[in-house]
Design a protein with these regions (language model features):
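Short boundary/loop segments of OB/S1/cold-shock single-stranded nucleic-acid-binding domains
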Residues: 21-38
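OB-fold (S1/OB) nucleic-acid-binding surfaces
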Residues: 52-76
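Netrin-like (NTR/C345C) domain of secreted extracellular proteins
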Residues: 81-203
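Bacterial Sec-dependent signal peptides at the C-terminal "C-region" and cleavage site
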Residues: 14-22
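Bacterial N-terminal signal peptides
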Residues: 5-15
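Extracellular secreted precursors and ectodomains with disulfide-bonded cysteine-rich loops/domains
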Residues: 21-23, 79, 127
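Structural detector for short beta-strands of small beta-barrel domains
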Residues: 37-61
């Protein structure tokens, strides 16, 4: 009888592992290939996280209607093809291409685990099947931006200005311009920026 609690715990763990089965999806492409098919592209900071959701404070809307309030983004739980919530800690900044949740799905909400859900209608979801998010530090972004290897979230690249990414989303520059910027020599670019700053001071 002493083994019974241990057996129950083992069965519970196995059931949990089954419930967390990995999703199956094909790689949809880098950010430049997938962002146009989403509802909202924003530069935002994570202000809170709970269960499989995070709350974002939008700092800049690259495409779509500018949210009037903070927005909630639903991430991985069960076999949903979304990234793990732990990837987006409070205080971190991101560029995200998001899909709005416009309908309820069967089994998407369990009242016994209200913080683990498919998501509420009107909120947003983030796909893991492509370059749907980019890491942002200040005014610079990195990630699977353009012509990057499949499933590689932080490929070797030179950080690209957020303004340039915004111009791409707005159709003002080409993907080739982003690719060129991501391959620039960081030292040469820093020298160019310093030179421009010096010339402005002289004027």
């Amino acid at each position: 009888m002493r083994c019974l609690p241990l057996l129950c715990a083992l069965l519970w763990l196995l059931a949990g592992a089954s419930a967390r089965a990995d999703c199956e999806c094909l790689w949809q492409g880098s950010f430049t290939e997938v962002q146009a098919g989403t509802d909202l592209v924003v530069s935002a900071a994570v202000i809170a996280g709970k269960g499989n959701s995070i709350d974002l404070r939008v700092e800049h809307t690259l495409r779509g209607p500018t949210p009037e309030h903070d927005i909630r983004v639903w991430l991985k739980t069960g076999d949903y093809c979304r990234p793990e919530p732990q990837l987006f800690p409070a205080g971190s900044q991101w560029v995200m291409a998001l899909q709005q949740i416009d309908e309820e799905v069967e089994g998407g909400f369990n009242p016994h685990t209200p913080n683990l859900s498919y998501g509420r209608v009107g909120d947003y979801s983030l796909s893991s099947c492509g370059g749907y998010w980019l890491s942002q530090h200040g005014n610079w972004v990195t990630g699977n931006l353009v012509e990057a290897p499949r499933w590689v979230r932080e490929p070797k690249m030179t950080p690209v200005l957020l303004d340039l990414v915004a111009d791409y989303v707005a159709g003002k520059v080409s993907a080739q311009a982003l690719l060129q910027a991501s391959r620039e020599d960081p030292a040469a670019r820093e020298l160019l920026l310093d030179t421009r700053a010096f010339l402005r001071e002289q004027n």
